[in-house]
């Protein structure tokens, strides 16, 4: 395995993460060890098999500040999928012990502002903080069709929609509107899901857009926390009609709305969506509408086993 080091003080092979990643041949398995510091960079990482490893989420920070409403260098608005702080693609990705942040600010000012755009076929995030406001984490692929002109403008707008399997463990993910979204299959274990209070009437944690035969987003043993007003945050809404989110054995703060989930904007097409819950606890746990499925113990165990088989890395 190729190992390269990044240090802002000049003691490593490179002084920036982008330079280190660029130096890695696509086909070579590589470890990029990133020292402490705030790396203000917009990162594109497209490698066959690469690990980015910091020295702790509070010590190694990758930060950028593009927002969907802000102007792009081509004269058009940046839009959602060009706003990323880090874009990841390739076959296998591992990110550990660092923060990836989009600090463009609240959506009212900056628009959608992606911290991590994860397009790798298989991706693992361990002890990572993903911080932003609107649209913090995009779990690719995109839906088949955009609803607005230039809505998918970005690195994969014209590419075939390929499935991805993503695993997040011991991470913190923060944002306010649809801050975990996309069509990927993703398992979140032992994570803190923090809704940021940006003084908006309602916030939404997930916006899944996957297909009916996919896994969607599964959360197990996670803490949903926030300083937002009680009952003002929804666990999810379907970005596309067949979107799926399941919340298993999680602790829900008082900010979670009693309904748990809601339709997309003024749409009422919740019939195809799959929102499910099992053994939620905390002040945000409540009786849900009939279209939110309450899983039995065996059903929840079967779903979790399937999610782990699909998303957990084969080799740690």
Describe the residue ranges of each PLM region.
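Sequence-level preference for short, compositionally simple segments enriched
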Residues: 2-316
């Amino acid at each position: 395995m190729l190992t390269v080091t990044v240090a802002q003080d000049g003691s490593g092979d490179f002084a920036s993460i982008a330079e280190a990643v660029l130096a890695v041949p696509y086909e070579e398995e590589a470890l990029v060890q990133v020292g402490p510091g705030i790396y203000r960079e917009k990162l594109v990482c497209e490698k066959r098999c690469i690990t980015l490893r910091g020295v702790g989420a509070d010590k190694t920070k990758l930060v950028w500040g593009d927002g969907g409403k802000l102007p792009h260098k081509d004269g058009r608005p940046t839009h959602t999928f060009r706003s990323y702080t880090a874009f990841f693609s390739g076959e296998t990705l591992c990110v550990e012990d660092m923060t990836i942040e989009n600090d463009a600010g609240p959506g009212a000012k900056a628009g959608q502002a992606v911290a991590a755009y994860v397009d790798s076929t298989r991706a693992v995030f361990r002890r990572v903080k993903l911080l932003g406001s609107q649209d913090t984490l995009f779990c690719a692929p995109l839906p088949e069709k955009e609803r607005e002109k230039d809505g998918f403008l970005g690195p994969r707008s014209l590419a075939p929609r390929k499935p991805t399997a993503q695993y997040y463990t011991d991470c913190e993910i923060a944002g306010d509107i649809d801050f975990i979204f996309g069509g990927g299959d993703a398992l979140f274990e032992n994570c803190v899901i923090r809704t940021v209070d940006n003084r908006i009437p309602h916030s939404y944690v997930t916006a899944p857009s996957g297909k009916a035969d996919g896994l969607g987003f599964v959360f197990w043993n996670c803490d949903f926390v926030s300083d937002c007003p009680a009952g003002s945050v929804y666990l999810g809404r379907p970005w596309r009609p067949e979107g799926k989110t399941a919340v298993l054995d999680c602790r829900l703060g008082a900010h979670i709305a009693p309904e748990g989930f809601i339709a997309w904007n003024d749409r009422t097409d919740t019939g195809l969506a799959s929102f499910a819950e099992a053994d939620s606890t905390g002040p945000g746990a409540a009786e849900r509408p009939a279209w939110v499925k309450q899983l039995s113990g065996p059903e929840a165990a079967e779903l979790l086993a399937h999610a782990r088989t699909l998303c957990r890395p084969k080799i740690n």
